[in-house]
């Protein structure tokens, strides 16, 4: 398992908590990914067009779109569950726009996230986003209050950050999810 910082794993893999039969998942990983939203997964011809434009491939993530698709087709489930790449996808959708076979690598990446969530293999990037979502109402930290003021906008955006009741409601919803049971995000 790779480490982001010393002692901090990229992915906290709790797949051993899942109630599914592991061998069945390994046999059917491509079919499961298709069921989770990557309907055209098997149309990929590994041309590399998506990899040529993917920010994840450019910065060195191991299982960027093209490699992820190949690994899914080969059934390399365990290797993928331990990798943070699907959680790092920035959803730019460039891969989908350039794909000559309309595979939608973006959808493959998000289907992989769904599988990882079902298997409790939650990336540290996702956990940090969930912490921020619980604390501030945004999955991504909202910086730039000074910049907002300079251009005449309110200091806080019109979201849960400026609506305490909405933030309270969001926290109630999050407390009712499996996330609360796992205890990965502190919820007072």
Curated annotation (Swiss-Prot):
Broad class of where this protein is predominantly found: cytoplasm
GO cellular component, one term: plasma membrane
Protein name as it appears in the record: Heterodisulfide reductase subunit C-like protein
Keyword Ubl conjugation in annotation: no
Protein residues bound to [4Fe-4S] cluster 2: 54, 89, 92, 95
Keyword 4Fe-4S (UniProt): yes
Subcellular location: Cytoplasm
Domain 4Fe-4S ferredoxin-type: 34-64, 78-109
Family annotation (InterPro entries): 4Fe4S_Fe-S-bd, 4Fe4S_Fe_S_CS, HdrC_iron-sulfur_subunit, Helical_ferredxn
Protein species of origin: Archaeoglobus profundus (strain DSM 5631 / JCM 9629 / NBRC 100127 / Av18)
Assembly, per entry: The heterodisulfide reductase is composed of three subunits; HdlA, HdlB and HdlC. It forms a complex with the F420-non-reducing hydrogenase (Mvh), which provides the reducing equivalents to the heterodisulfide reductase.
EC numbers: 1.8.-.-
Protein family (similarity comment): Belongs to the HdrC family.
């Amino acid at each position: 398992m790779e480490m982001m910082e010393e002692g901090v794993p990229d992915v906290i893999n709790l797949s051993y908590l899942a109630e599914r039969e592991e061998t069945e998942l390994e046999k059917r990983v491509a079919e499961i990914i298709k069921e989770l939203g990557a309907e055209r997964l098997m149309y990929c011809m590994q041309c590399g067009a998506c990899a040529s434009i993917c920010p994840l491939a450019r910065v060195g993530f191991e299982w960027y779109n093209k490699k992820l698709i190949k690994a899914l087709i080969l059934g390399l489930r365990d290797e993928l569950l331990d990798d943070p790449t699907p959680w790092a996808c920035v959803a730019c959708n460039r891969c989908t726009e350039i794909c000559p076979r309309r595979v939608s690598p973006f959808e493959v990446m998000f289907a992989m996230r769904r599988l990882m969530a079902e298997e409790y293999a939650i990336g540290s990037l996702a956990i940090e986003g969930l912490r921020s979502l619980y604390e501030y109402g945004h999955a991504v930290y909202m910086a730039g209050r000074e910049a907002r003021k300079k251009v005449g906008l309110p200091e806080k955006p019109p979201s849960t950050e400026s609506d305490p009741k909405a933030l309270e409601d969001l926290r109630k919803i999050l407390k009712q999810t499996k996330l609360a049971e796992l205890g990965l995000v502190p919820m007072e």
